[in-house]
Amino acid sequence: MVRPTAFRMNEETAGNNYYQKVLDNVSPEDIVDQALEEFDNMVDILRSEGVNVIVFEDDPETDTPDSLFPNNWVSFHADGRVGLYPMLAENRRVERREDILFDLEHVHRFKISEVVDFTEFETHSVFLEGTGSIVL
């Protein structure tokens, strides 16, 4: 899980993500504080139920309001393959972090046998945002 330090309505994705809205009378700082509190509470609940939760801190140098949703840029598969997906929004692309994959493999002992990188499709304006996409 990625701890959100810049959480807010993402102006780059709000046009096609109808779950986002501007919250009147709530400061950006209050939104981040509430998101962090909810995140930390969820981590505590999951751990109290025996779930092994790995938390990565968001990169404070980047503007990544959706960083707590890594399931859109990466997927992990039982056979050790990792998928990296092409993202529509520029600030979502910045969420992809090699340090996370490195730590998962070398610190947390995840088996990574192959990284399947589809991100080249961004240059062709073709996007498939991991679990954010559904094929019917």
What are these regions, as identified by a protein language model?
Residues 1-136:
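The feature marks the mature, well-folded catalytic cores of soluble enzymes
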